[in-house]
From Swiss-Prot:
Disulfide cysteine pairs (residue numbers): none
Sorted UniProt keywords: Ribonucleoprotein, Ribosomal protein
GO molecular function: structural constituent of ribosome
Gene3D superfamilies on file: Glucose-6-phosphate isomerase like protein, domain 1 (3.40.50.10490), Helix hairpin bin (1.10.287.610)
Protein name (Swiss-Prot/TrEMBL): Small ribosomal subunit protein uS2
InterPro entries linked: Ribosomal_uS2 (IPR001865), Ribosomal_uS2_bac/mit/plastid (IPR005706), Ribosomal_uS2_CS (IPR018130), Ribosomal_uS2_flav_dom_sf (IPR023591)
GO CC term (a single one): cytosolic small ribosomal subunit
Protein species of origin: Prochlorococcus marinus subsp. pastoris (strain CCMP1986 / NIES-2087 / MED4)
Pfam families tied to this protein: Ribosomal_S2 (PF00318)
Length: 234
């Protein structure tokens, strides 16, 4: 049985690619046709890729792999946070800060600073500071929560990055590849499938398309982790 049906993908608009002049020829094998100057993605191939992505992701989760969801554009931001939280993954949904992976030691220190500030806020320690100092600390806390809040549970580098919009998140792609971190990527018609281990050709601009694909991947992670826990119990 298919992980995602053709009708679900059609309803979500997953078949709409970019304008034909903005395409990457490497995506040609996933393109069905062009209509009114827009490439149409072959959803039969997307369904096959989703079956593979689901199995791959489930097996990775079952073997204890750690996941990071990345998608910072407006259409994807809320969905990325929602689905990452649902499957216990870390996430970046506001802005990719240079060195998030390749300069992990520094990034980890910033995450610890965030946790310290949150403890200070909840204990009332910030409120006890002089007004100006408290305002500075709260601004720092707000900024760190915005950009690093989704990484608080990430104690080590991830094993897998799940990506929405490869071109927008090009820095994340470069850092992951430099560190040999696997990439599961939603690929629109302007992307390069050679830059990821697990390609999923689909519309990465429509909210419903992003919701559908990330939702299934989150399901796969939860299923894999449940299988891992069941194995340990036995």
């Amino acid at each position: 049985m298919a992980v995602v049906s053709l009708s679900e993908m059609m309803e979500a608009g997953a078949h709409f690619g970019h304008q034909t002049r903005r395409w990457n020829p490497k995506m040609s094998k996933y393109i069905y046709c062009a209509r009114n100057g827009v490439h149409i993605i072959d959803l039969v191939k997307t369904a096959l890729c989703m079956n593979n992505a689901y199995k791959w992701t489930r097996n990775a989760a079952k073997s204890g792999k750690r996941f990071l969801f990345v998608g910072t554009k407006k259409q994807a931001s809320d969905v990325v946070a929602q689905e990452a939280v649902r499957c216990g993954a870390a996430y970046v949904n506001q802005r990719w800060l240079g060195g998030m992976l390749t300069n992990w030691t520094t990034m980890k220190a910033r995450i610890e600073r965030l946790k310290d500030l949150e403890r200070m806020e909840s204990s009332g320690a910030i409120a006890m500071r002089p007004k100006k100092e408290a305002a500075v600390l709260r601004r720092e806390l707000e900024r760190l929560q915005k950009y690093l809040g989704g990484l608080k549970g990430m104690r080590r580098l991830p094993d897998v990055v799940v990506l929405v919009d490869q071109r927008r998140e090009s820095n994340a792609v470069l850092e992951a590849r430099k560190l040999d971190i696997s990439l599961v990527s939603m690929l629109d018609t302007n992307c390069d499938p050679d830059l990821c281990e697990v390609p999923i050709p689909c519309n990465d601009d429509a909210v419903r398309s992003v919701q559908l694909i990330l939702g299934r991947l989150a399901d796969a992670i939860n299923e894999g982790r449940k299988g891992s826990n069941d194995q340990r119990k036995n």
